[in-house]
Amino acid sequence: MTSKESQSAKFIDLHGHHSSSKSEDRDFLYIYSYSPKINDLPEEGQFFSAGVHPWEIEDARISFEGVKRLCGESNCLMVGEAGLDRSIVDDSDLEQQEEVFKWHIQLANELKKPLIIHNVKCLSEIFRLHKQYPNHSNWVLHDFNGSLSDIQECQKRSIAMSLGPRFYESQTARIAHTISDHKIDLNLIFFETDERGDINIQTIYEKFAQKQEIEIDDLKDRIWQNLKALLGTNLTS
């Protein structure tokens, strides 16, 4: 990486549902995640993603056309969050979630934008759908909570993973043990604050760098390059 590229790298908060005091800071790039019944519309000029969260798919008031229109805006960098959540339904009710998820997959493909994915205990289903749509846009699993083998399988399939604060806050989360016990290939790795507006994304970078024994500037540069690859564009500072 050239010195110019290094100087332009930012701390990336790939996914958050809160307003961010750092969103105007030249050293930070925050992507606000909009879901119709969870939070407010993005502010003018703000980078964002838009989608129908699995928790809200039964709400008849949701306008899928409105979400589609938002996703077509230039400041919308990703489609979603959308996905599958086994914790709120039994297996027989996953079908409705899957149909809505497929709608998002097709929309992301149509717009040629990455898809950010909500996954709770449905990784095998995510992999199946990933294989079912071979010519899809880039995918990201948000708040990833998996083992080393899960990370390696995602990297093999070119599915990106975004890590939230649970890898250093939780004593029981799988990702906490994975990060503590193994050296992680930074290919396709990102970080996020999710619902935690009380946490600075830089803190998450620093915690990961400390646990993985790498320089924070090297980590920052690598995640920036990951974002450029994810979006298929050259980002400017």
Give, region by region, the residue ranges found by the protein language model.
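Mid-domain alpha/beta scaffold segments of enzyme catalytic cores
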Residues: 1-237
